[in-house]
Amino acid sequence: MADATDITFLADLGLASDQYSVDETVRAEHATDWGTDDADGVAPTAVVYPESTADVAAVLEAANDHAIPVTPYAAGTSLEGNPIPTRGGISLDCTRMDAIEAIRPADLQIDVEPGLIGSEINAALEEYGLFFPPMPQSADISTIGGMIANDASGAKTVKYGEIHEWVRALEVVLADGSVVELGSKAKKSSSGYNLKDLIVGSEGTLGVVTRATLELTPKPAQIRGGRAVFESVTAATDAISAAITAGIDVATIELIDPLSARITNEEFDLDLPDAPMVFLEFHAAHSIETEVDRCRAIFDDHGLLRMDMASEPAEMERLWEARSDLANAVGRYREDLRMLTFGDVTVPMGEYSTIVGYIRSLAAEHDRLIPAFGHAGDGNVHYTVLVDPDDPDDVAFGKELMDRIIDRALELGGTATGEHGIGRGKREFMTAEH
């Protein structure tokens, strides 16, 4: 086997001196991510910062010739060890490739490099009245390249779908350094194999995306947001399922369980009831109140206590800000406990009440704090077990409970990961799922 520490060939690739580093601190930073627990990865021998497709191609070709492993790296915000090397080699940090190359309003398209932070896309589109809808909650800190690699999704997936539905074309560098163009800028095509979608969600295992053409859509003329309070978690999940199966045109529908509500109140100084809630947002070109009323009527049949629609945009923005930071708030909730990496199972809508009920039954049976919330409109739930970090047995049992939730989701016809990806954290579930 080749020596993964022999990266002397980098000096012959024409890279600038600041485009690669063997600094111990830099290498250590690229041996971890935001969520990996007890990482079994190996720090890369070198970190390379390409600034163009040509740089990526040169590095991959040379690494391939020398049998040196390369692990693509974006913002490092993944939760499952996706960008962490397992055999050392080179960490290919694409964050310097962060340009918006073109905005074509007439085509409803934008061309971007992979290192661009997601929220910067929508900021640039403001003046055109357009937006890119399928952003994850981490859009302010994660890159579009990482989102494409994970086939990311977020709160608006229930209406707008996942990233792969909005990627029109990709420029990809393969392991041998060859550059391929996949997809097209046409709205539709029946030409040949859909290789573009094979790359989306492949987590950097098949190639490195160096340019993406994304589809856009006009910003909705009408937006209404609010919250609904229910008599029980089961009532809330049943109401969500009923609304979705009835075809309610909702852009966001988020479950917040009582523990998550309590954490939100303490962290953000809000006065939300410590009760099961659903956060909602509707997008429409016209007649938005009709859809709000339809949703309210369905909720009324499923244990609705109160449904309040925000009168001012700032009021709802405050709730969405709290929801976006809820995972971090959970981590700060108890000084004596720490959270395990958040899970993100997704199940068919008809089983949503079942999986949330199962999570709550585990919490009750084992006297555990297991907050549960998530993008309920597409069957997704986020959860974590709070454990005593100083008690190895407690940590191990917490991980066992996390695994049980995944096993149950798979039994229900769901997936181990709705949006965080496989990485190293969920590899053991691949065989059972596929």
Where are these regions (language model features)?
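N-terminal flexible segment immediately upstream of the FAD-binding catalytic core
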Residues: 1-61, 77-108, 258-268, 315-342, ...
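N-terminal accessory segments
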Residues: 1-36, 66-68, 298-318, 411-416, ...
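C-terminal substrate-recognition/cap domain of FAD-linked oxidoreductases
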Residues: 22-32, 217-218, 224, 229-232, ...
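Short, ordered loop/turn segments at secondary-structure junctions
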Residues: 74-77, 137, 255-258, 421
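Short beta-alpha connecting loops at secondary-structure transitions
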Residues: 98, 105-108, 226, 390-393, ...
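FAD-binding subdomain of flavoenzyme oxidoreductases
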Residues: 99-254
